[in-house]
């Protein structure tokens, strides 16, 4: 079996990239997955993606690996490019791990994601989107509020100053997002309470791995309990040291409610294979979805990998399971477990290649015009 691991390599493109550490981490994950998947029966290759996605497409069209592990989270240091590689893989008819281009698009644009969640009856904090500082007068929600970039992941753009308690600090936080990230600011009601993560694995059936909770320590005394960029990506910072994740202890009823809410959110945004749903649990027991992370961090020391380990799934088995999910979606059966025949059947089925199908349609149309039909 030939496996291609695609990952973005764009962390050096911008001198002032505010998400540099998150983009750098993807390469480490790619190497870890390559090592976990490599065996005498599997050939695994790393394919970095920088800016020229068309060259990647040509290489994929020529090489046609049996399955692609998609780790691309941006393109040319722009998070909106996250959808480009899966869309390309869909056009080429290549099976790949993780959420589709549609699901990634819906999840990335946080305001659209929240609109869909609300339409499905999934609890999420009240919110609004501001494209200019002048729109501050339209904000009617009660404080405290939290201000985030509207289309970033991995806590990019979040720090203690993101949680605001008055109009003046709200204006500063919104202005900072607009200037730094060149995108609208998402303003939502800040939910005081516990921060809980629900990791999800699989499709039919989908299962919840053991829930985890952030333990906010001394660095958060008299500060908002919020996972900032520093807490997530700067391991020597006090915010990171004092916000470890650990087992989440809930009553059976409350745990079931959190899992049900997470499952509904994942389904609403067309997510698949694996991911994590982040929640705030209010003192009254109401759980609110604050973020959905399809294709979440797969580093061996990530929260997702640790949750899988707690469920009895070691890292190599987790990596192989994600590959199997992609192949099952492509072939609809377990033939791929033989690590060979399924791939031959896929390559022979050229009708799966949408580019080839479109080329055939164009050729037929040209012949029809030549005949004067």
Q: Where do the PLM segments sit?
A:
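Hydrophobic beta-strand scaffold residues
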Residues: 44, 95-96, 124, 145, ...
């Amino acid at each position: 079996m030939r496996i291609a691991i695609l990952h973005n390599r764009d962390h050096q493109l911008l001198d002032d990239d505010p998400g540099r550490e998150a983009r750098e981490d993807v390469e480490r994950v790619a190497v870890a997955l390559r090592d976990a998947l490599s065996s005498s029966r599997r050939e695994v290759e790393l394919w970095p993606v920088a800016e020229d996605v068309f060259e990647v497409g040509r290489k994929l069209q020529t090489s046609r690996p049996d399955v692609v592990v998609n780790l691309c989270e941006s393109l040319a240091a722009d998070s909106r490019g996250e959808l480009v590689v899966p869309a390309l893989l869909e056009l080429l008819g290549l099976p790949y791990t993780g959420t589709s281009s549609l699901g990634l698009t819906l999840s990335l644009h946080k305001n659209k994601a929240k609109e869909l969640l609300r339409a499905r009856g999934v609890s999420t904090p009240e919110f609004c989107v501001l494209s200019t500082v002048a729109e501050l007068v339209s904000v009617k929600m009660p404080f405290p509020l939290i201000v985030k970039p509207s289309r970033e992941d991995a806590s990019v753009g979040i720090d203690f100053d993101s949680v605001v308690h008055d109009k003046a600090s709200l204006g500063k936080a919104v202005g900072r997002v607009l200037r730094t990230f060149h995108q609208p600011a998402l303003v939502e009601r800040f939910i005081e309470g516990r921060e809980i993560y629900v990791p999800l694995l699989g499709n039919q059936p989908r299962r919840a791995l053991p829930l985890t909770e952030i333990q906010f320590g001394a660095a958060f005394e008299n500060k908002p309990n919020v996972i900032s960029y520093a807490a997530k990506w700067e391991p020597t910072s006090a915010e990171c040291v004092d916000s470890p994740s650990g087992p989440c202890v809930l009553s059976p009823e409350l745990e079931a409610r959190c899992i049900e809410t997470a499952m509904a959110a994942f389904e609403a945004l067309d997510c698949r294979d694996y991911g994590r749903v982040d929640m705030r649990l209010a003192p009254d027991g109401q759980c609110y979805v604050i973020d959905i992370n399809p294709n979440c961090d797969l580093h061996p020391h990530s929260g997702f990998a640790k949750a899988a380990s707690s469920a009895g799934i070691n890292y190599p088995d987790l990596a192989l399971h994600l590959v199997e999910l992609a192949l099952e979606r492509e072939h609809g059966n377990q033939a791929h477990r033989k690590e060979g025949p399924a791939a031959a059947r896929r390559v022979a089925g050229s009708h799966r290649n949408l580019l080839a199908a479109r080329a055939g349609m164009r050729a037929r149309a040209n012949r029809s015009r030549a005949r004067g039909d």
